[in-house]
Amino acid sequence: MKILAMDERREELSAKSTVQNVKISEAPILDGKVNNEDSHMEIDQPEGSMEEDDHRQVKEKNTSENSVEQKRGRRMFGALLGTLGKFQQESEREQKSARKVKRAELEEKLAKRREQELQELEKQEKIEAEILESRLQEQRKVALDELELDRNDLKKVLDNKKSYYLRTKTQPSLFYRPYYLLPSQRTQLEQMKSEAP
């Protein structure tokens, strides 16, 4: 790096001091080459600058070749980066599409799971409702049975108490108990007591 920088500095200094008047006449160009017979250059140079001139021409040739190579390398590098970018974009698209597919599969699984859970919950609620209904029916039945028993007990108590009273023959019947009983009333009360449960 240091050698190249020093060479470039020398070239700049020698180019400033050696080249003062350069005249190039128009020369016919054949196949991209200048015809040397018709052209002439007048250069006022001090002696010993031919080597530097040759060295500079070689350097310029090398730098021009290097710049062409650099440009070519940059183009190739750009093309390579473009290709890599395309592959990266394609792989990202594939990953995104794969992610979308996985996400869709996952959402489908979740939807199925939710549906199954809802069905299970509906079944559980239905079973619980049936159990609750059966319990309520049992409770109603037990309550009705208890009411029937209470009614029967009450009827027995009433029938038993009725056996101590006389009844009128008119409707609605009235129950009464005279303070003094006649013998016929006494036999009627005894008969009612024997019929009572």
From Swiss-Prot:
GO terms for cellular component: cytosol; nucleus; spliceosomal complex. Residues 30-73 are annotated as: Disordered. It is found in: Nucleus; Cytoplasm. InterPro entries: Pinin, Pinin_SDK_MemA. The keyword Glycoprotein does not apply. Belongs to the pinin family. Transcriptional activator that may participate in the regulation of mRNA splicing. This is Pinin homolog 1. It comes from Schizosaccharomyces pombe (strain 972 / ATCC 24843). The lineage of its organism: Eukaryota, Fungi, Dikarya, Ascomycota, Taphrinomycotina.
